Curated annotation (Swiss-Prot):
It comes from the Bacteria. GO terms for cellular component: cytosolic large ribosomal subunit. Forms part of the ribosomal stalk which helps the ribosome interact with GTP-bound translation factors. Is thus essential for accurate translation. One of its GO terms (molecular function) is mRNA binding. InterPro entries: Ribosomal_bL12 (IPR000206), Ribosomal_bL12_C (IPR013823), Ribosomal_bL12_C/ClpS-like (IPR014719), Ribosomal_bL12_oligo (IPR008932), Ribosomal_bL12_oligo_N_sf (IPR036235). Gene3D superfamilies: 3.30.1390.10, Single helix bin. It comes from Vesicomyosocius okutanii subsp. Calyptogena okutanii (strain HA). GO terms for biological process: translation. Keywords: Ribonucleoprotein, Ribosomal protein. Homodimer. Part of the ribosomal stalk of the 50S ribosomal subunit. Forms a multimeric L10(L12)X complex, where L10 forms an elongated spine to which 2 to 4 L12 dimers bind in a sequential fashion. Binds GTP-bound translation factors. This is Large ribosomal subunit protein bL12. The gene is rplL. Belongs to the bacterial ribosomal protein bL12 family.
């Protein structure tokens, strides 16, 4: 007897009618003691956790210093602890990250401080 390949078997099944395929499946279930019914993963669906993970670290990005450049420089200097020249250079190079990995509370406080002096800020 010649060995049948998977492709030969698939081609033979493709040429069969639907009724013949149903009978073939039934015969295979009987011969091998298996069931062709689909198993529904009900337990898996029930275990899915729908909680949203809230970000807890933010990078504060100065996108624009607006019209009050001097006030923004002072605020950046106060926030970062940098010198006047470094703060000025940082503000003038906007968009720039003012602080990395800040907590949510700290990031919101810095954002508020910068917006109060007219800067545009983004939390990432």
């Amino acid at each position: 007897m010649a060995k049948l390949t998977n492709e030969d078997i698939l081609n033979a099944i493709a040429d069969m009618s639907v009724i013949d395929v149903v009978e073939l499946v039934s015969a295979m279930e009987e011969k091998f003691g298996v069931s062709a019914t689909a198993v529904t993963p009900v337990a898996v669906v029930a275990d899915v956790d729908n909680t949203v993970v809230e970000k807890d670290e933010f990078d504060i990005m100065l996108t624009s210093f607006g019209e009050k450049k001097v006030a923004v420089i002072k605020a950046v200097r106060s926030i970062t602890g940098l010198g006047l020249k470094e703060s000025k250079d940082m503000v003038e190079s906007a968009p720039v990250v003012i602080k990395e990995s800040a907590s949510k509370i700290e990031a919101e406080d810095i954002e508020r401080q910068l917006k109060e002096v007219g800067a545009s800020v983004e939390l990432k």
